[in-house]
Amino acid sequence: MKRKYRPHNTKAQTWEYIENGYIEYWQGKHERLLELVRHIKNSHFKDRLFGSTSLDKLVVSIYDPIDYHQEALHITFDLWSRKWHFKYIAMPFQKPEFVRTYDEEKGIEKFDNFIKMIKW
């Protein structure tokens, strides 16, 4: 039986809105995610990439609305282990194509590398 896919679409938030959310809601606890959002906001990515947040997760895509289960990069930063977690979901009903964990200081570099690798 073939499964029917229903997109989990979410309207993208502006990078300013996301930045303010990390400042106001998390009150400095997620400084690494805030740094990444500021990096995107202040780069040429700001007009090519769309973002959305879900609690402590940043989801990035090239589409608006963002489908969380299709062509979406899910990024979290673990406050206890001080590690970045990147998970790229290309297609629904399939395992993520890309799952990586990075040291704290490598987040922005690895984000830029991922965007270049996937040609976003």
Predicted features by range, described:
Residues 1-66:
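Negatively charged, low-complexity tracts enriched in Asp/Glu with abundant Ser/Thr
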Residues 1-17, 91-120:
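Mixed-charge, Lys/Arg-enriched low-complexity segments
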Residues 20, 33-40, 60, 73-75, ...:
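Generic hydrophobic secondary-structure signal
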Residues 33, 46, 70, 108-115:
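Generic N-terminal initiation segments characterized by hydrophobic and/or small/turn-forming residues
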Residues 65-109:
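Intrinsically disordered, low-complexity regulatory segments enriched in Ser/Thr/Pro
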